[in-house]
């Protein structure tokens, strides 16, 4: 591939790429690791870790409660065009909790349909932090990046030389 398609600059082993939505894969790995360590269950209601979730109004009175597995599989019922957008790692978790506290709309009943959800994965990131007692970034770095030898994986790109940072394309 290309570091810069317009200038036809090829990618190299030194090229740096933004993680963007790939953080969802790392988040899922972290949740499964915490599950394997017995620190949480995929069947746990999300409200166990985010009490504000218990105040949400579902589409029907008999709708199932959102659990961690719903967030992992994007079947929580959140709309794709969600208010959180791409998870902003520099935003405090309090902003996410405030969003939940204000109420999240639903497009489906939990477990009854798939819709891509940044909000769901932001909530999982919060759960990783709460259960591990570490910041999300620190947990992922220490428990996933380092053991996998991902020594050139960065959260912030300010220190990366511009000629090594790939331009993202859709």
Predicted regions and their residues:
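Short, conserved catalytic-motif segment at the N-terminal edge
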Residues: 1-19, 39, 93, 101-105
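Short, surface-exposed loop or secondary-structure junction motifs
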Residues: 2, 58-170
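Short linear capping/connector segments at secondary-structure termini
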Residues: 2-4, 14-15, 45-54, 85-88
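Catalytic tyrosine of NAD(P)H-dependent dehydrogenase/reductases that use a Tyr as the general acid/base
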Residues: 17-20, 114-116
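Active-site SXXK
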Residues: 18-43, 121-129
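Generic hydrophobic/packing signal
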Residues: 30-35, 50, 72-79
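Short, glycine/proline-biased beta-turn/loop segments that scaffold the active-site neighborhood
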Residues: 42-59, 146-148
């Amino acid at each position: 591939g290309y570091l810069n398609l317009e200038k036809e600059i090829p990618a190299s082993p030194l090229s740096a790429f933004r993680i963007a939505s790939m953080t969802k894969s790392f988040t899922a790995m972290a949740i499964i690791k915490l599950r394997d360590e017995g620190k949480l269950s995929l069947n746990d209601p999300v409200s166990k870790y985010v009490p504000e979730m218990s105040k949400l109004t579902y589409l029907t009175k008999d709708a199932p409660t959102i659990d961690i597995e719903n967030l992992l599989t994007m079947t929580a019922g959140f709309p794709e065009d969600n208010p959180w957008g791409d998870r902003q790692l520099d935003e405090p978790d309090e902003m996410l909790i405030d969003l939940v506290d204000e109420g999240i709309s639903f497009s489906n009943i939990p477990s009854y349909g798939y819709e891509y959800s940044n909000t769901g994965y932001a909530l999982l990131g919060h759960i990783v932090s709460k259960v591990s007692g570490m910041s999300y970034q620190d947990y992922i770095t220490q428990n996933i990046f380092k053991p996998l030898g991902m020594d050139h994986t960065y959260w912030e790109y300010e220190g990366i030389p511009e000629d090594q940072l790939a331009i993202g394309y859709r």
